[in-house]
From Swiss-Prot:
<keyword id="KW-0456">Lyase</keyword>
<dbReference type="InterPro" id="IPR013096">
    <property type="entry name" value="Cupin_2"/>
</dbReference>
<feature type="binding site">
    <location>
        <position position="96"/>
    </location>
    <ligand>
        <name>Mn(2+)</name>
    </ligand>
</feature>
<dbReference type="InterPro" id="IPR014710">
    <property type="entry name" value="RmlC-like_jellyroll"/>
</dbReference>
<protein>
    <recommendedName>
        <fullName>(R)-mandelonitrile lyase</fullName>
        <ecNumber>4.1.2.10</ecNumber>
    </recommendedName>
</protein>
<dbReference type="InterPro" id="IPR047263">
    <property type="entry name" value="HNL-like_cupin"/>
</dbReference>
<feature type="domain" description="Cupin type-2">
    <location>
        <begin position="42"/>
        <end position="104"/>
    </location>
</feature>
<dbReference type="GO" id="GO:0046872">
    <property type="term" value="F:metal ion binding"/>
</dbReference>
<feature type="binding site">
    <location>
        <position position="55"/>
    </location>
    <ligand>
        <name>Mn(2+)</name>
    </ligand>
</feature>
<keyword id="KW-0464">Manganese</keyword>
<dbReference type="Pfam" id="PF07883">
    <property type="entry name" value="Cupin_2"/>
</dbReference>
<comment type="similarity">
    <text>Belongs to the cupin domain-containing hydroxynitrile lyase family.</text>
</comment>
<feature type="binding site">
    <location>
        <position position="59"/>
    </location>
    <ligand>
        <name>Mn(2+)</name>
    </ligand>
</feature>
<feature type="binding site">
    <location>
        <position position="53"/>
    </location>
    <ligand>
        <name>Mn(2+)</name>
    </ligand>
</feature>
<feature type="binding site">
    <location>
        <position position="94"/>
    </location>
    <ligand>
        <name>Mn(2+)</name>
    </ligand>
</feature>
<keyword id="KW-0479">Metal-binding</keyword>
<dbReference type="InterPro" id="IPR011051">
    <property type="entry name" value="RmlC_Cupin_sf"/>
</dbReference>
Length: 131
């Protein structure tokens, strides 16, 4: 058994290459080999969001606070709230973040394939975000 204590892993700022706006990433766990799963708590300030991206084995989001938006390529922007669970299929291009006037926090859980859990793409434009 291994216990990760709260605060044992430093918070980090979401890199500008992958995020628009102010985003804080609090790593929660990365299971040791041979397990592939990792998780983090991610907080988006109002209007902050990820760039478009995919996950080779999919991603689960569990909204814990605030109000957010999520969109898959070709789909509508969906509003998400605490308690909502969002699943993105492997390879599904998507983004997620806070609503324009409200912060949002979610748990993000994904698995690694050949050591990689995410493929980052272009930023979500303001026009795409405001749809």
């Amino acid at each position: 058994m291994e216990i990760k204590r709260v605060g044992s892993q430093a918070s980090g700022k979401g890199p500008a290459d992958w995020f628009t706006g102010t985003v804080r990433i609090d790593p929660l766990f990365q299971a040791p080999d041979p397990a592939l799963v990792a998780g983090a708590s991610v907080t988006f300030e109002p209007g902050a969001r990820t760039a478009w991206h995919t996950h080779p084995l999919g991603q689960t989001l569990i909204v814990t606070a605030g109000c957010g938006w999520a969109q898959r390529e070709g789909g509508a922007v969906e509003e998400i709230h605490p308690g909502d669970v969002v699943w993105f299929s492997p390879g599904e291009k998507h983004w997620h973040g806070a609503a324009p006037t409200t912060a949002m926090t979610h748990l993000a859980i994904q698995e690694r394939l050949d050591g990689k859990a995410v493929d980052w793409m272009e930023h979500v434009t303001d026009e795409q975000y405001r749809r």
